[in-house]
Each structure stands twice: as C-alpha cells, then as structure tokens.
Amino acid sequence: MNIFDRKINFDALLKFSHITPSTQQHLKKVYASFALCMFVAAAGAYVHVVTRFIQAGLLSALGSLGLMIWLMATPHSHETEQKRLGLLAGFAFLTGVGLGPALDLCIAINPSILPTAFMGTAMIFTCFTLSALYARRRSYLFLGGILMSAMSLMVLSSLGNLFFGSIWLFQANLYVGLVVMCGFVLFDTQLIIEKAENGDKDYIWHCVDLFSDFVTLFRKLMMILAMNEKDKKKEKK
C-alpha cells in the first residue's frame, strides 16, 4: 500500500480526550478572545506607527495598567461579560500602542524584522501551546516555581545593569527571557486547563495571561533580531 494514499484523520489529531468537553468549550472562548486581542493590539500599534494619533508613553502605560487592574477587580459573571470584554479590548489596544517605540526602532533598522518576529513568535507560541494541550495534565505545572525564580533573577540583573551598562548582560537577559517566556506558555496553558477543570471559567482573564505571554515573546524576539541586524550592518562598514 502506498503511504501517500493514506488519509490523514484531522479529527483524531485535534481530539483531546484527556480534557473534558466543558473545558474544551472554555478553551475555545479563551482563544477566540485571544484572537480579538491580537486584532485590537495590531490596531493600536498601527495608530502609533502610522497615524501618530496616539503615542506610546507614560499615559498609555498607566492606562493599560489601569484597565488590567479594573478588569481583574471586576467579577466574572454573565452581567459583566460585555463590560469586561470592553476592558480587555482597551487593554489590548493600549498594549499595542505601547509596542510603538520598539516597532519604530525595528523599522529604522530593517522593516523586514517585524514580519519575521511576528511569524517566529506565532510559530513558537503555537508549538508550545499544542505541546501543553497534548501533554498529560499537570505535567508542566512544576515549572511555576522555576519560572518565577528565573523572572526574579532577570529583574534583579536588569536593575543591576542600569549601573553596569553591560551589553552582554542585556543580550543574555533577552535570550534567557525568550526561553523563560516559552516556559510560561506551557505553564499558563496547563494552568488554565486545571483552573477550568476546577470550575474557574473566567475565560477573559485567562486570555490576558496568554496575550501577555505572546506580547512579551514578540517583544523579546523582535529586539533580538534588531540587535543581530544592527551587528551585521556594523560588520559590513
């Protein structure tokens, strides 16, 4: 029998038997909200880079933080669902605006960095998400303590680098941060599943976790590509 004549059963590939139907429905809502966030964040980035109508700065950062706190403080219920979706969209929009300065920098160095960084982030995020979904339940939850410790060390090294000004430490922080965020995609995805299995159906807040992971991954990969491109240009001179 020719192996090329075999039919691929895509239904079997997308079947997560270890996840209950109610949690699968919850995940659909989470990723639908995530798609909404991506679209709105792209609009926010467009507003900063192209129209300049709203500029990234202290006000946009405080606005993003304020909307996230407001969203967190608003209880999840059917009555507050539309309000919280509006807060989520506002948070995503201002997050996109906040990416503006990094986008401007990359465009100045080489505009092709942006699609490369986005496609790379999308591939990384998708691969690690599928790994978490197909893996045995709770198999990646042990990463929580390790990831938080790594984040603490990264924050301390970043603060220390304000005084030392080491480019090597800055680059190391970017690469380590990229690896840590990949771990957070695994951890957060499985944590969302466990929360849903235990009755926490707040898909809007769960979306915030994944959206924040994606944006941080994108920012770090974008900066790594920008630095590499800048180094290449220096070598050519």
From Swiss-Prot:
Sequence position, cross-link Glycyl lysine isopeptide (Lys-Gly) (interchain with G-Cter in ubiquitin): K7
Membrane-spanning segments: 30-50, 53-73, 87-107, 113-133, 140-160, 167-187
Mode of membrane association: Multi-pass membrane protein
Side Cytoplasmic, residues: 1-29, 74-86, 134-139, 188-206, 228-237
Keyword annotations from UniProtKB, A to Z: Apoptosis, Autophagy, Calcium, Endoplasmic reticulum, Isopeptide bond, Membrane, Transmembrane, Transmembrane helix, Ubl conjugation, Unfolded protein response
Lineage top rank: taxon: Eukaryota
Segments in the Lumenal topological domain: 51-52, 108-112, 161-166
Post-translational modification: Ubiquitinated by BFAR, leading to proteasomal degradation.
Chief localization: endoplasmic reticulum
Entry comment, domain topic: The intra-membrane loop at the C-terminus acts as a calcium pore, mediating calcium leak from the ER into the cytosol.
Similarity-based family: Belongs to the BI1 family.
Protein name: Bax inhibitor 1
